[in-house]
Swiss-Prot record:
Transmembrane segments: none
GO biological process: response to host immune response
Organism listed in the record: Mycobacterium leprae (strain TN)
Start and stop residues of the Sequence repeats: 209-214, 230-235
Parts forming coiled coils: none
Chain residue ranges for the region called 2 X 6 AA repeats of S-V-A-Q-S-E: 209-235
Entry keyword annotation includes NAD: no
Name of the coding gene: sra
Protein name: Serine-rich antigen
Family indicated by similarity: Belongs to the mycobacterial PPE family.
């Protein structure tokens, strides 16, 4: 590709004459010169502002360190300015070489004229009368070949030599220390990762759980106190002969409220525990990247939530004990009411002798124990029923058996 000696003079002349010429080379050289000037101005401005003014105004270790680090940046700007100027000089040299190669090239029309003239003479050289002229034209063509090939070869050598002088641009020096870079990367990764969102969400859930536990504990305490008050009032105001439905309803109400209270406590404790576990796991995984203020807030939140849960458990335990005591008293009253109310007999049973007669025949002999058991504490209460049963047995056939008659 770069061996221009193998190309004929017309080919080299054609390749050199086509294209935009050296105009792009001159334009690129001017651009690099402008860049070199801007870099030199920037380096001078930074040097005058920081390297010289800061140590003079603020003497100390910090200002000296700043001036030292900025000095490396100023040196980098100066080096790039020199490199840009070198590239501009190289482009100038290449443009000059191109102009010289074009100027030393045999024009394309001259080469084509020689070729056409030689071919025409050869066409009429029947007897060799123009052989000398043809040989001279061919010798001129050979000189054209050498001249054009030499011009292209010289241009090639100049371009390779000048471009070899250029140097690569160095990256900018690091003005910030490695420690500050690591801290910045840690903060950026913490703010951009999902773990920070999960941590903030867990903290919010923990605050919500504590608030719900306090609110639910207050409501449960109020409901338990109201239930205990209603049970105590029912125990004091009800008569000994009341029906067992009232005490049973109070007992069911207190048991239901206690169950709901304990169920709410379980759900609150579960949610608070989940929030605590999530917060602990996230805190341990991001302990190396979060700020100390976040860790202190998490520790304070955990302590507050633990104290709130302990207070709520103590209040629920005291409420459960109060409800159990009241329920035991109501159950005792219900037992007495059942033993009394179950033996009340309506007055119209005195006329219903035949159905009682049939029932008495079917009662087994062991019913004497039941009659004896209930007749003791109910003196003066079961007398009408006893008289009815005695009259009914006396009017019948008396096949109830000796045990039944003795019981009656």
């Amino acid at each position: 590709m770069f061996d221009f000696m193998v190309y004929s003079p017309e080919v080299n002349a054609f390749l050199m004459s086509r294209g935009p010429g050296s105009t792009p080379l001159w334009g690129a050289a001017e651009a690099w010169i402008s860049l070199a000037e801007q870099l030199m101005e920037a380096a001078q401005e930074v040097s005058d502002t920081i390297v010289v003014a800061v140590p003079a105004s603020f003497a100390g270790e910090t200002s000296d360190m700043l001036a030292s680090r900025v000095s490396t940046f100023v040196a980098w700007l100066d080096g790039n300015a020199e490199n840009a100027g070198l590239i501009a000089r190289v482009l100038h040299a290449v443009a000059y070489a191109f102009e010289e190669a074009r100027a030393g090239m045999v024009p394309l029309l001259t080469v084509l004229g020689n070729i056409i003239h030689t071919m025409a003479l050869k066409a009429i050289n029947w007897f060799g009368q123009v052989s000398t002229t043809v040989a001279a034209l061919e010798a001129d063509y050979d000189l054209m070949w050498v001249q054009n090939s030499t011009a292209m070869t010289t241009y090639r050598d100049t371009v390779l030599r000048e471009t070899g002088k250029m140097e690569n641009f160095e990256p900018a020096p690091q003005l910030v220390s490695r420690y500050c870079m690591d801290r910045r990367d840690s903060v950026n990764s913490f703010h951009s990762s999902s773990s920070s969102d999960s941590l903030y969400e867990s903290i919010d859930n923990l605050y919500d759980s504590v608030a719900q536990s306090e609110e639910h504990g207050s409501d449960s305490m109020s409901q338990s106190y109201n239930t205990c008050g209603s049970v105590a009032q029912s125990e004091l105001c009800d008569s000994p002969f009341g029906t067992p439905s009232q005490s049973s309803q109070s007992n069911d109400l207190s048991a239901t409220s206690l169950t709901q209270q304990l169920g709410g406590l379980d759900s609150i404790i579960s949610s608070a525990s989940a929030s605590l576990l999530t917060t602990n796991s996230i805190s341990s995984s991001t302990a190396s990247s979060i700020m100390p203020i976040v860790a202190s807030q998490v520790t304070e939140t955990l302590g507050r939530s633990q104290v709130a849960v302990e207070k709520m458990i103590q209040s629920i335990s005291s409420t459960a004990v109060s409800v159990d005591v009241a329920a035991s008293k109501v159950v005792a009253g219900v037992g007495q009411a059942v033993s009394v109310g179950a033996l009340r007999v309506p007055e119209n049973w005195a006329t219903a002798s035949q159905p009682v007669m049939a029932t008495a025949h079917s009662v087994p002999a062991g019913c004497s124990a039941i009659t004896t058991a209930v007749s003791g504490p109910l003196e003066g209460v079961t007398q009408p029923a006893e008289e009815v049963l005695t009259a009914s047995v006396a009017g019948g056939s008396g096949t109830g058996g000796p045990a039944f008659n003795e019981a009656v």
